[in-house]
Amino acid sequence: MIILENEANEPGFRIQQRAESETGKKGRFGGILKENPIKGFSSETLTRPLTGLFRKTGKSQRKTDDDDSQETIAAPPTNFPNMARISATIESVQINDEYAGYRDRNPETGSKLTLNEGAGVFGNAMHPLTRYFKVGDVDVSILGRSFPTEKTVDEEGPWTAQSLFNSLESRIKKERIDAKDQPSDSRSRNARETLISSKY
């Protein structure tokens, strides 16, 4: 601003227009928005700062259905340890999935192995309850879900806090009695505890 003192018709000051400098505007983003920006910066990075995180592949062809299915398979990052072994495993899984016999192993369709076939294959390894039933062509996977694999014993009464406390107390008493019956172990343990306490 320039202040004028002697002119009566004009106000006491006037605004002088500055010529635009070649360096551009001076401000926070002045250096970034120049015609020749700093290397690595552009006006696009200001509007979309996260685009550098997601790199595009070099493929610019149209995608087909096969490409879409291949891209849905997850792959570990390249800096992952044992990358070669993991990628080999992924490739082998992909190859095995394309195998024609995959449908037989698919859990949705089931193995379709019946008890008659399974008895010859597995022999005595079948569940012991299966010999008591004539099930014919029932799927083995269904039987595995319906029959328990362990013998279950029902408790005489319902569990309560008192019954749990009593059973725990009886176990502790039994362990103490067993410990008294084996004096050599308890003496060596007491000797070790005495030795450790005397050191520290």
Curated annotation (Swiss-Prot):
- Note whether GTP-binding occurs among the keywords: no
Record note on disruption phenotype? No visible phenotype, with no defects in cilium morphology. Double knockout with intraflagellar transport protein ift-139 results in defective cilium morphology and function.
Location in or out of the cell = Cell projection, Cilium
Q: Where is the composition biased (Basic and acidic residues)?
A: 175-192
Q: Which domain of life is it from?
A: Eukaryota
Q: Does the keyword Glycoprotein apply?
A: no
Coiled-coil regions listed: none
The alphabetized list of GO BP terms reads: cilium assembly; intraciliary retrograde transport
Q: In which tissues is it expressed?
A: Expressed in ciliated sensory neurons.
The terms describing its cellular component in GO are:
cilium; intraciliary transport particle A
In this chain, the stretch annotated as Disordered covers 56-76, 175-200
The protein's UniProt keywords, in alphabetical order, are: Cell projection
Homology family = Belongs to the IFT43 family.
Q: How does it assemble?
A: Component of the IFT complex A (IFT-A) composed of at least che-11, daf-10, dyf-2, ift-139, ift-43 and ifta-1.
Functional description taken from the UniProt entry: As a component of IFT complex A (IFT-A), a complex required for retrograde ciliary transport and entry into cilia of G protein-coupled receptors (GPCRs), it is involved in ciliogenesis. In particular, may act redundantly with the intraflagellar transport protein ift-139 to regulate the transport of specific ciliary cargo proteins such as che-3 which are related to motility.
Descriptive protein name: Intraflagellar transport protein 43 homolog
Per the UniProt record, the source organism is: Caenorhabditis elegans
Gene assigned in the entry: ift-43
